């Protein structure tokens, strides 16, 4: 598995192996219909928060197929689906299916709504979120009875992180524009922004949010429609804010890419997703970033 190169052009497939993941214990995996001596490579492109989880899965896959190489290009300005369409990559990791390309949901991710810990709010409704992020509600006093007469500080996410689109779809206004808000890219930048503004509100991937709370960040994960944001509620689908993690495949994807998809969908791959990717999160602290398997177990 190769270094992720933070450039806006695709790397060649012969880069060095990624070094920043703490090794997951390999989990036994049957061959799933592919030759034991599987050889070759595949290029995976993405730009969202799924990076470490997918790389951990790739590390497991390569352990059982040592003559293969799963290479990554992961950058904020990457265009995963476009690269697949242009035959520049085998797999695009995205947050939605594409009608014209083979698309498979491989896991789920919750989206946590976060506020500053000093803000007394604990729960919020979908309707309130929609009014806040559309600008109809502008003050915390309009959200809850004890709320201060203070303007709400909106912190939006960039369009290329697979988070904003499903969040706005949940609120019922895809591609909504015209609301003034601070824009942040990475999860840890969001936590820092929330920490620095008592009246702020934003949304992040559930795994990093749960880890941030565990690590002592001053953030509150709000109940949404009376459902607690936690691993089990995302897993069983009762928590309303969740999004798919999708593999969009090149129609001419390499045998290695196809075998990797089979592995991720296998019981062993889904178990690895449930365990979580042990690695270095974006703020360089040790963490466990979990996604949610498909079977709900």
Residue spans for each PLM region:
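N-terminal secretory signal peptides that target proteins for export/translocation
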Residues: 1-12
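Intrinsic disorder/low-complexity segments
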Residues: 5, 16-19, 43
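Compositionally biased, intrinsically disordered low-complexity regions enriched in proline and serine
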Residues: 3-4, 20-21, 204, 292-293
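Composition-driven detection of intrinsically disordered, low-complexity segments
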Residues: 12, 17, 288-289
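Exported/periplasmic ABC-transporter solute-binding proteins
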Residues: 33-78, 82-86, 92-109, 114-297
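Bacterial N-terminal signal peptides
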Residues: 17-30
């Amino acid at each position: 598995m190769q270094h992720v190169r933070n450039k806006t052009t695709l790397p060649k497939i012969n880069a060095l192996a990624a070094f920043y993941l703490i090794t997951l214990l390999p989990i036994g995996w049957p061959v799933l219909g592919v030759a034991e001596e599987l050889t070759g490579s595949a290029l995976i492109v993405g730009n969202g928060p799924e990076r470490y989880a997918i790389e951990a899965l790739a590390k497991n896959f390569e352990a059982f197929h040592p003559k293969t190489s799963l290479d990554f290009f992961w950058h904020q300005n990457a265009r995963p689906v476009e690269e697949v369409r242009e035959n520049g990559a085998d797999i695009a990791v995205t947050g939605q299916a594409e009608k014209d390309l083979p698309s498979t949901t491989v896991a789920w991710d919750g989206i946590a709504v976060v506020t500053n810990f000093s803000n007394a709010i604990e729960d919020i409704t979908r309707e309130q979120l929609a009014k806040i992020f559309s600008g109809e509600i502008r003050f915390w006093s309009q959200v809850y009875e004890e709320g201060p007469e203070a303007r709400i500080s909106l912190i939006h996410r960039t369009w290329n992180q697979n988070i904003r689109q499903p969040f706005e779809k949940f609120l019922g206004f895809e591609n909504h524009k015209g609301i003034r808000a601070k824009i942040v890219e990475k999860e840890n930048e969001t936590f820092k922004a929330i920490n620095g503004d008592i009246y702020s509100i934003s949304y992040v991937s559930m795994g990093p949010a749960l880890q941030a709370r565990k690590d002592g960040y001053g953030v509150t994960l709000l109940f949404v429609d009376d459902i607690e944001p936690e691993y089990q509620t995302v897993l069983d689908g009762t928590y309303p804010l969740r999004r798919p993690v999708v593999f969009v495949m090149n129609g001419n994807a390499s045998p290695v890419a196809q075998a990797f998809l089979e592995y991720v969908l296998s019981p062993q791959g889904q178990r690895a997703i449930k365990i979580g990717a042990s690695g270095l999160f974006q703020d360089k602290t040790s963490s466990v970033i979990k996604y949610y398997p498909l079977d709900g177990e």
